Amino acid sequence: MKIEEAIVYVMVKRNGGMTTDQIADAIHRQGLHQRKDGQPVTSNQVYATICRFPEMFTKEAGRIMLMI
């Protein structure tokens, strides 16, 4: 699963905003996405992905919200 799909999956399951650390941890715990080097997703990767998809995500008060 692509990282953006994993972020949406995690956020749909949780009603309300999440921090990038919470999202990265949930993706890792559920095994939804793994980097090419085998390491778990980082909060920086989550943040970069969210910035690439402003039509899907918004940032408010340090939390990421799903817009779709």
Regions found by a protein language model. Name each.
Residues 12-15:
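Short helix-capping/hinge SLiMs at alpha-helix to coil transitions
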Residues 1-4, 18-21, 26-68:
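Charged low-complexity interaction tracts in eukaryotic proteins
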